[in-house]
């Protein structure tokens, strides 16, 4: 009887551990759920301005910033609705939001940019939650949480303004921080729309 009980616990644990799921939530204030959709199809020369807004207790912010920049560059590589060639492109992390939008619009208008994409990374991290009831359970996940705001330089119109959260995990998962980069990359691809055909 004890063997059957132990076997059942092992099988149950394996079944629960295999229950990994992905969720993605988009909170839109303006525009459509994808960058390259409908009225946003001809964005011209684009500049991407990444920044961070980490928690006060964020671990290894420099490492996460480096991971984020790599994944932003990878995700925007085949952007189908605009050009990232000079003078546009993906800039280094800075505090872009500390400047008034009118100042950014003027600055990048003078540089020949058509569209500004402000991309603020707020979370790029693994989570681990425990319950101390019987049986003891833990749930692990990786999360990417960011805000994206896209502006037309000529008109100042807000083309897109949304918050995106994507996480993957489940019961009995232990996931390293490095896996969070895949969440950011996948979320960026999801909101980008169709990719450029080579």
Question: Model-flagged regions — what are they?
Answer:
Residues 53-56, 93, 122-127, 166-169:
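Solvent-exposed loop/turn segments at secondary-structure junctions
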Residues 136-198:
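Short secondary-structure boundary motifs at beta->alpha junctions and helix caps
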Residues 7-17:
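Bacterial N-terminal signal peptides
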Residues 64, 68, 72, 100-104, ...:
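Stable alpha-helical elements in mature extracytoplasmic
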Residues 98-158:
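Surface-exposed short loop/turn segments
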Residues 1-4:
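Positively charged n-region of N-terminal signal peptides that target proteins for export
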Residues 89-99:
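Amphipathic, coiled-coil-like alpha-helical scaffolding segments used for oligomerization/assembly
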Residues 17-90, 163, 193-198:
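A structural "domain/chain start" motif
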